[in-house]
Amino acid sequence: MIEIKNLTKFYGRNAAVKNLSFTVNDNEILGFLGPNGAGKSTTMNIITGFLPSTSGTVTINGLDISENPSEAKKMIGYLPEIPPVYLDMKVKEYLKFVAGIKGVKRNERNQQVESAMEKLKIKDVEKRLIRNLSKGYRQRVGFAQALLGDPKYLILDEPTVGLDPNQVIEVRNLIKSLKKDHTIIMITK
């Protein structure tokens, strides 16, 4: 379960997020909708522990993200608005690299990478440099890295940005199927 209580974030005197509270139960999908500048991405960055809140609490599976950031982050797969991919790496090479950083056991890395590539339909570009991929493929590589380590929670900031209409449908169906094993919070347009 993810619990957000009275979450507030100020930048100077401007409130990006003010007294936000909600709960996402296990195996639920919560979608954030709102105009640009409404604080959606700021909220995601606080939930994932990449940005401190001004006040309030974020609890991930019983762990306060500010008190136990390392343990809480191990349970989260995060796809930021702009995927953090290394442009000079090949797709499979990058995903194996990320799996290692996430602490996936060496004997499980290849299987997890293959599974993520299959789910995101990127096997056909596994040997290509990321810099040579379209925005849609880069987005799917970013989504694949979020799945590595088999996180219980997925935080997805606009996971369908840059995808063509058919890919949007595929990714939405994938997200629905992931619900059986994951709790998902996502920003969508």
Give the role of each language-model region:
Residues 129-136:
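Conserved ABC ATPase signature
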Residues 148-152, 181:
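A short, proline-enriched helix->beta-strand linker immediately N-terminal to the Walker B motif
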Residues 143:
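Hydrophobic anchor residue at the start of the ABC signature
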